Amino acid sequence: MNQYETVFILTPVLSDVQMKEAVEKFKGILTAEGAEIINEENWGLKKLAYPIQKKSTGFYQLIEFKAEPQVIEKLEINFRRDERVIRFLTFKMDKYAAEYAAKRRNVKSTKKED
């Protein structure tokens, strides 16, 4: 199994319930295909660097997971078909990126405890 990280941007016109529903849909696709979700972060509403589909903001979401390579194709097909997703990027993490992500998670968890 390889470790992947995917960041996707949801359209800003969604309510909180609709946004969570979309995220749960993609997490469900991953778990149904046998992926192990390691981390999930909601980065919130952010300004885009340039307009995408006439929108200047979007809800950013990050999901870090371990999966087989064929799962990525199914996930990205669902990203393309879903009108709520305006942009996405999935990449395979090498061992250094995975170590860095683990350190970052540990730092965030210690900050939350303080």
UniProtKB/Swiss-Prot annotation:
It holds the Pfam family Ribosomal_S6. One of its GO terms (molecular function) is small ribosomal subunit rRNA binding. SUPFAM superfamilies: Ribosomal protein S6. The keyword RNA-binding applies. Keywords: Ribonucleoprotein, Ribosomal protein, RNA-binding, rRNA-binding. GO terms for biological process: translation. GO terms for cellular component: cytoplasm; ribonucleoprotein complex; ribosome. The keyword RNA-binding applies. Disulfide bonds: none annotated. It comes from the Bacteria. Belongs to the bacterial ribosomal protein bS6 family. Binds together with bS18 to 16S ribosomal RNA. This is Small ribosomal subunit protein bS6. It comes from Phocaeicola vulgatus (strain ATCC 8482 / DSM 1447 / JCM 5826 / CCUG 4940 / NBRC 14291 / NCTC 11154).
